[in-house]
Amino acid sequence: MESIVQAKRVLEIFKEMSQIPRESGNEKGISDYIVNFAKNLGLEVHQDDQFNVVIKKPASPGYENRPSIILQGHIDMVCVRDHDSNHDFSKDPIANIIEGEWMHADHTTLGADNGMGGAMMLAILEDDSQQHGPMQLLFTTNEETGMDGAFAIKEGQVSGDYLLNLDTEVEHDFTVSCAGGCHVHVNIPLLRENNQPGYDAGLSFTVTGLKGGHSGIEINEQRANANQVLTRVLYDIQQQYPVCLASFEGGVKHNAIPSKAVAVLSVRAEDVAAIKTLIAYQEKQYLHEYGIQDPGLTFVVEDVATPDVVYADDTTEALITYIYLAQDGVHSVSKSIPNLVETSDNIAIVRENEHTIEILISIRSSNSNSLEFLAKKMILLAKTLGVSAERTGGYPAWEYDKGSKLEEQAISLHNEMFDTPANVNAIHAGLECGLLKGVLPNTQMISFGPTIVSPHTPMERVHLPSVENVYVYLKALLAKLQ
């Protein structure tokens, strides 16, 4: 198309990449393609056991004393197809269909996230007319399902003064910070006993209809957490009626705000009508509390068989008390970046294991000290109740480096080149830059990229004029960085 002039080679390389299966966990083929690409250029290249690739290219003549630069992106893609598509991601090429200013696939994800960034990196690599300081290219794997590639990068494997990540998905946006995170697993001993005499009715109580959402993205909207709403109502029922809890389950993913939670209760038949009335009243109260952000909130109560076995009182008390007291949602906002959530937690999953009831709490913060405080607070609450808790899965934050030389130069150049001013932002989710900052603590980082709409869906498409603009900008930035 006419708007693509300098980025023609980028689209050619992207088409080549689209011939190679690269679903997360199946990246050897695309990793080998990149290795051979570098070898054909006579460049130093290293591939590790996670299929991460590091390519080193010397500085352009006269640029030997410029800052060293890392270009970074991930090579895997999310593979999703329409229900009526028979596309086989393990072997079939991804179509590159251009309509007007946009490229999309054929009823599948396109893989522009982050394949277009990778194609830009390779186009830069083979262009010997491009001016740049000492340069390394880092291609990471399995970003979409756990950032395993970035987790595997070791100190000394890659180095540079500046790192340019090409995985931001809105042209003119520059990401300068992301949250770190960890999980806290609370394990309550699962003690059961026979149902007590007189408890001759069963009720299933479901909190449903909530929006849920990604706990690193939608947490700022302060949506209802189904696990905590269910717990709060159960506590109020317990204050008025004899109740035995037979089961409790809610949430499915560590990074999703739970939209549904279900409990089964053993109650006295004479109290059933009153309990149903109380729950109906509580539904109105919670719609008043959450109706703006969660207008679909619904309480569903159904008669079920009377449970033969219920939780012991100690199990029920520890479960209800912990979830009731554990603060959920936004804890603090950034003092440096307007409207950015700094620290949050999500009571993500409550599930029965063989011998315990596990509560999984996902904690995020762009401030490492705040992250530590909240994790310790959640563990201390468990210990206070006499149950065990452990911290797992930590990954570092990419803390905002206000006034960094890289940010100053990148934003200044962008605003010289384009009428649309740069939008500097941060996100509350985890990014590869956060992990890489752990092994590159003195490297200044920034992230940008072309506009990609509906990533991770068959409607994914990339705006081609933005590919041209970002590539032209990247070339200019590499030549100018000091």
Explain the meaning of each model-derived region.
Residues 10, 335-338, 342-358, 362, ...:
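Zn-dependent metallopeptidase/amidohydrolase metal-coordination segment
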Residues 101-104, 144-145, 151-364:
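Midchain, well-structured core segments that form catalytic/ion-binding scaffolds
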Residues 218-220, 225-248, 375, 400-443:
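Active-site-adjacent substrate-binding region
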Residues 63-139, 143-145, 150-161, 324-328, ...:
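Active-site metal-coordination/substrate-binding segment of hydrolases
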Residues 2-101:
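Acidic/His- and Gly-rich active-site-bordering loop/insert found
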Residues 75-77, 138-146, 168-171, 211, ...:
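Acidic, glycine-rich active-site loops and adjacent beta-strand->loop/helix elements
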